[in-house]
Amino acid sequence: MTTLADLRTNYSRASLDAADVNPNPFVQFDVWFKEALDAQLPEPNTMTLATVDESGRPSARIVLIKGADERGFVFFTNYESRKGRELAHNPNAALLFYWIELERQVRVEGRIEKTSEEESDRYFASRPLGSRIGAWASEQSAVIESRALLEAREKEIGARFGENPPRPPHWGGYRLVPSSIEFWQGRPSRLHDRLLYTRDAASASGWKIARLAP
C-alpha cells in the first residue's frame, strides 16, 4: 500500500535563472500569470492569503486576485471577517500562488492597505447580482444555526435592494504592497530554482534579485 511518505514528483518542466527574468517582479509576475492562462490552468487567479491574529496564531485561506500592478496585489472581501479583523490588527501578510501544472510558485510578503472607496465601488458594481446580494446576506466567519437562515437572509436582501444593491460598508478591497516577491520553479532532485526580489532604492528597477538555496 502506498503511504504518504512514498508520494513524490520529480519536477523537470523548466528552469529559472536571473539572467532570463525581468528586473521588475511585477512584469515577471505578469509573464508567469499569462503563461498560466495560456496553459488553461484551473483558476490560476487563486492564491493563499496568510494572516496572523493578535496572539500570533496564523490562519490561511484561498482568495481570488483581482488586480496586480506596480502598487501591489488586490483582492476583495468582508472587512469584518476573520481575515479582515486580523489585518486590522496586523497588516503584515503573505500570498502564495501555486501553479502545480507548471511546477511553479510565487510567494509575496508585505503589508496590507485598503483600496480606495472608488476602487471598491467599481469592482463591487461589476460583480454578478447574486454575489452582490451575498455580500450583504453573509456575516462572514460568524457562527450561524443553519443554511436555511442564510438563504432566508438572501431572499430578504434581494427583496430590499432589487437589481441594484449598493456596496456594503463592511465590504471592499485590500492591496498587499510587497516588500519581497519570490519566484520558484521546480527542478529535478529537489534542487529547485528560487529567485527572490527585494526592494532596492539604488537599483534602476527599484528591486534586487538574489538566488536562494532550495
Swiss-Prot record:
Q: Origin, by domain of life?
A: Bacteria
Source organism of this protein record = Burkholderia pseudomallei (strain K96243)
Q: Name one Pfam family in it.
A: PNPOx_N
Its annotated function is as follows:
Catalyzes the oxidation of either pyridoxine 5'-phosphate (PNP) or pyridoxamine 5'-phosphate (PMP) into pyridoxal 5'-phosphate (PLP).
**Its family?**
Belongs to the pyridoxamine 5'-phosphate oxidase family.
Recorded hits in HAMAP family, A to Z, give: PdxH (MF_01629)
Query: Which GO MF terms does the UniProt record name?
Result: FMN binding; pyridoxamine phosphate oxidase activity
Protein name per its UniProtKB record: Pyridoxine/pyridoxamine 5'-phosphate oxidase
Which InterPro entries does this chain map to? Pyridox_Oxase, Pyridox_Oxase_CS, Pyridox_Oxase_N, Pyridoxamine_oxidase_dimer_C, Split_barrel_FMN-bd
* Subunit structure as annotated in this protein's UniProt entry: Homodimer.
Reported EC number(s) for this entry are 1.4.3.5
| Residues binding FMN, per UniProt | 61-66, 76-77, 82-83, 105, 140-141, 184, 194
Which cofactors is this protein said to need?
Answer: FMN
